[in-house]
Amino acid sequence: MKYKLLLWGVGAKYNALLNRIDELVNDNQIEIVGITGNSGIPQSSYLDGYRVVDICDISYLKFDYIVILNDTHFTEILCQICQMLGDTSKVLSYRVFELPGLIFEEYVELKESNLTIISNNCWAGTAYNCLGLECLSPIKNLFITDVDYLKLLHDLKGYFSKELRYKSNAIDPHSGKQYPVMTLGDIEVNCNHALNYEEAIKQWNRRCKKVNYNNLFIEMYTEDKAIEIEFSELEYEKKICFVPYDSDLNSSLKVELYKGQKMFWQAVNSNASRAGLKYDLISLLLKNEIKMRY
């Protein structure tokens, strides 16, 4: 299927991604129906062979998605589109064009599936950010120990229905900053990127409302073989456990540290980011398929 796209924004981001956009057009994955924006738009009918459209006329265009090619003013543009069209469900981030080996149809399928990613640290949030997708998970900017995380996974709905409570403060050994340690029933949730416990509770409650229990992807990393085995026995359709050693379990994948990395979690998280190299993130999340890049 060829998707009709309206590009919103010109400038540095547009110039940086133009060759990638042209490649997808030539590959018949997308069709650019127009380029628009608030500023910097040339007084010309076409730019790089694509039609220039006035913002006032976009409601008359037929398109599948609007792609915002602006990082600095992304939120403001999103609000503007919502005011104009009454909806932002058909808005994509420019980050879609930064994904290596992109199959646009698979990206759209992943977006429309409203996937909730559950992880034991920042991997979920990193993956959403890399893909330019809305975070539909409370597990963002925090970490949970292996044992407590397995408890959570054995009764996800039950734990997510509990109240997140403040327990104490701790010091992040990497940043030296203080952060709130929370409890969710009998498990601890370390909100190591939250400014205070009030913010942690607010963000947790807001994101818990977005969880899609009908489409879950469960991620974990561990250096403990017994934990890995217990994770493999969990009855989730889509799941992956990253380990630093060879494993014959279908739900596990060995990840090595890159040069300059000292902690295993650094290697795990970096592969879910825009710097990731080891596997295809979309194939993993959409089809539970480990598609190696090397």
Regions found by a protein language model. Name each.
Residues S89-Y294:
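Extracellular glycan-modifying ectodomains
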Residues M1-K62, V67-E106:
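Hydrophobic, well-ordered beta-alpha structural blocks that scaffold small-molecule cofactor pockets
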